Amino acid sequence: DKAAKTGMNAIALTDHGNMFGVKEFFNYTKKKNSKTKDQIKALKAELGKTDLTEDQKAELRQQLAEAEQRLFKPILGCEAYVSRNSRHSKTNQEDRSGYHLVLLAKNKTGYRNLCKLVSLGWMEGFYYRPRIDHDILKQYSEGLIASSACLGGEIHKKVERGDLVAAEEAVLWYKEVFGDDFYIELQRHKTDKPNADYECLDK
C-alpha cells in the first residue's frame, strides 16, 4: 500500500532463502488490482463498439493507458544463499552460510525454476541455511533475473578481501549464465567500512 501511495507500480518480495510469503503477497496484489482490472475490461468493451468517433476512441485509449499504468505488479523472487563450495559440502565453517544472490522471476518458466532452486536449497543444500550452488543455478537459470545482492554477495566479498581477479571471474560467470539479465547492485546504505563503495568503484 505504501509503495502504491508513493507512486511506485511494482515491488519485489525477496525473503532470504525462502518463498513462504509469495502466495499472500500475490493474492493481496491481485485483490488490490481487481477494481482497476474491471475498469480496463469495461474500457476495452467500449472500444469494441463500432459507432465511436475518432475523438471518442482516442479518449478511451487514453483512459485505458492510464488504467493499465495503475495496475500494481508483484515481482516474485528470493534472496538465495549460494554455497561457497558445493551445496553438498557440509563440514567447514564456511559451509554454514553462503553468498547472497537476488533472484527474480520474469516469467512462468522463471517462477518454476525459482521454486525448484529454493526447494533444492532446503532438500539438498541445507546446512544452517538453505543453500544452492553454481551447478544448479546454471541448470535452472532460464527465466530468471539475477542481481549481485548486498554486502554479502559473492562479488562484493571478493572485492572486499582484495581478490579482484576472483571478483572479475565471478562477474563473468554470472554474465555467462544470465546474460543481460544479470545486474550488479550499487548501494548507498551506511556501513562500518568507510568509503567501501568508492573503493569498489575506483577499482
Predicted regions: what they are:
Residues 1-203:
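Phosphodiester-processing cores and adjacent nucleic acid-binding clamps
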